[in-house]
Regions:
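Carbohydrate-active catalytic/glycan-binding domains of CAZyme proteins
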Residues: 1-224
Length: 224
């Protein structure tokens, strides 16, 4: 008889919020942030990828660090890494997308295996080199999600929509790129990091919800 499955499903003292489950091969992998008990910041830990056989979801293991926080773009470890997501590219490699805390860009990691170790691959950019999140029609990037369709097309979802009082508070803390325009989707080129077409708005935010039917329940955060 197999053991019962229960929550929390990971070992005591392991905190992986924002979990994104994906099946690769015969294992279920969970990609998420890495929080610390009694911490003073959200998710200051290195990325870990926990996995289990699809036919035995009681047997969760994590054999290595998937990506260290003190990597490119964060050598001093000042920033935290928030909710990631992962997909397999047409080349068979695995691409992980994430944002540092309130840094308006999407970082891309790549690995030959689903659980890493991942290496830094670059940022999502428009064809002209502009970072996605800083273009004219872009939204603020936050907690991205990634989806590869059956036809091979790859779509990136992101967005953050703080209300006016929260935007003012964040601006006072020196965070100037906070927007309130909701969530977007962009299709990526085959290189998995270049925007292929103009971003499309999916769900309005506090700033632009009037007359849409989303008033009072606008997009806030976490496309992932």
């Amino acid at each position: 008889m197999q053991r019962l499955i229960w929550n929390p499903y990971l070992p005591e003292g392991t905190f992986i919020p924002d979990g994104e489950p994906h099946v690769f091969g015969n294992r279920l992998y969970v990609y998420g942030s890495h929080d610390k008990g009694r911490g003073m910041r959200y998710c200051p830990g290195d990325y870990q990828v926990w996995s289990a056989p699809v036919d035995d979801l009681t047997n969760w293991t994590c054999e290595k660090t998937a990506y260290h926080r003190r990597g490119k773009g964060n050598r001093l470890g000042i920033r935290c890494m928030w909710a990631p997501d992962c997909t397999q590219g047409a080349d068979g490699r695995y691409y992980l997308y994430f944002c540092f805390d309130f840094q308006n860009k999407v970082n891309v990691l790549v690995s030959n295996t689903p659980d890493g170790p991942f290496r830094y691959y670059g940022e999502v950019r428009h064809p002209n080199g502009t970072l996605y999140g800083q273009g004219k029609d872009d939204i603020m990037c936050f907690d991205p999600a990634i989806f590869r369709d059956d036809d091979g097309s790859v779509y990136l979802y992101s967005g953050y929509s703080a209300n006016e009082s929260l935007r003012k508070m964040l601006n006072q803390r020196g965070i100037r790129n906070v927007d309130g325009t909701g969530g977007q989707v962009v299709r990526l080129q085959a290189d998995m990091r270049t925007v292929a077409e103009k971003p499309r708005m999916l769900i309005p935010g506090y700033k632009n919800s009037a007359g849409t039917g989303f008033e009072g329940h606008e997009m806030y955060e976490a496309s992932s």
